[in-house]
Amino acid sequence: MGLKAKHKENLCSDSQRSKRLYVWIALAIVLSDFTSIFSHWIWGLLILILRTLMDLPTFVMNV
């Protein structure tokens, strides 16, 4: 029973994380449209932030 609850919890956090990812992608597209000169720099920064956000929950769970 405990395992099922934990699995359900993981599914919820995954769906929230994917929603956040879509928001970030939309934001990145808008930003790169407005500032095409800095698009590479913005993409690099966003990818770095996204990777940090993705790794953070797993890091916290491991600790």
From Swiss-Prot:
Pfam families: Phage_MS2_lysis. It is a single-pass membrane protein. GO terms for biological process: killing of cells of another organism. It is found in: Host cell inner membrane; Host cell outer membrane. The keyword Nucleotide-binding does not apply. Induces the formation of specific membrane adhesion sites between the inner and outer membranes, apparently leading to host cell lysis. Lysis may be performed via activation of host murein hydrolases. This is Lysis protein. The lineage of its organism: Viruses, Riboviria, Orthornavirae, Lenarviricota, Leviviricetes.
